[in-house]
Amino acid sequence: RGNYPVFKRNLRQWMMRITAYGKRLEDDLDTIDWPDKVRAMQRNWIGRSEGATVRFDVSGAPGAGSSPSVLEVYTTRPDTLFGATFMVVAPEHPILGGTAGGDADDEAALTLPQAWPEGTKNAWTGGAATPRQAVAAYRAQASAKSEAERVDEERTKTGVFTGLFGINPVNGQPVPVFVADYVLWGYGTGAIMAVPAHDDRDWAFA
């Protein structure tokens, strides 16, 4: 109310790791006397899928730092690895470093390059002078959006380049890493490999 800005803040809490029980929960649905429609709804909610976790080494981060040097992505189509043209991480992903989204000192705490890599396209920078400025500004914007707004399929996909590159493990090619709010930190690994030829959201972002 009153058009005051709303920001998300990270809080310590415990959560049940439902994914660890996904197979058991789904298998046990066959042992209970529920209507087929309800069991189908439960299976959709559990959302178990078959796939592979792929690790991309990350280059471009400034030497020492607490940020991880590997990005993990989950894919149901490992055969599309050769078609990955970029990667996208959630604004809250620890590879970026930083503080809670929207904090004034977020830019200084980001573990990103201090200058744009040579050949960076202007359209990737969000009009910022450095990757840290671009990502800090984008994280502040993303923190003011609800999860429903972020995953709205009708919304124009936005994002900025982080200055980092993931190394494709199958061919050794570097692929740029972007930050975008349509990727959620609480879903999967909080990072995706983007294959525009096989995914509508990746195509829209590209």
Each predicted region: which residue ranges?
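NTP-handling and nucleic-acid-processing catalytic cores
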Residues: 1-205
